[in-house]
Regions:
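Membrane-helix boundary elements
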Residues: 4-45
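Residues within membrane-spanning alpha-helices of integral membrane proteins
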Residues: 8-18, 51-54, 75, 79-82, ...
Length: 128
């Protein structure tokens, strides 16, 4: 498929991004909360489980990057992850407030969401 290179690159970047954040929140959650001056939750599992989910989604993005046309049916699940995170962060950001540590990731996820949507539409056309 033409123009598939940017889609592969996008999902390789998404893999690295989500897997890196997942590992960071599993192994270095205390350091991250301290760095951003945010009180950590009362148990590390509240942060480690979402970190593990980020690694799982990262692996899915890696699969999409390797075989975009064949794996395009997975993209909506990645989009839903981005919608879920953005919806929660932006809702709190614009209503009652949220610590600044969460905001850059919401902006990045919004960009990923839009690009995933464009990639999905292109890949669906290629499969048709």
């Amino acid at each position: 498929m033409k123009n598939q290179a940017w889609i592969k690159a996008l999902f390789y970047i998404a893999f690295v991004y989500d897997a890196f954040l997942g590992v960071a929140f599993i192994l270095f959650h205390d350091n991250l909360f301290a760095m951003f001056e945010v009180a950590p939750p009362n148990h590390p599992g509240y942060v480690q489980f979402p970190g593990a989910l980020l690694i799982v989604f990262g692996m899915m993005y890696l699969q999409i990057a390797r075989e975009p046309v064949r794996s395009c049916n997975l993209i909506p699940y990645g989009m839903l992850l981005k919608v879920a995170y953005c919806a929660i962060v932006f809702a709190y950001w614009f209503s009652s407030g949220i610590p600044g540590m969460w905001k850059p990731w919401a902006i990045a996820d919004l960009v990923f969401l839009v690009l995933f949507g464009v990639a999905f539409m292109q890949l669906r056309k290629a499969r048709a």
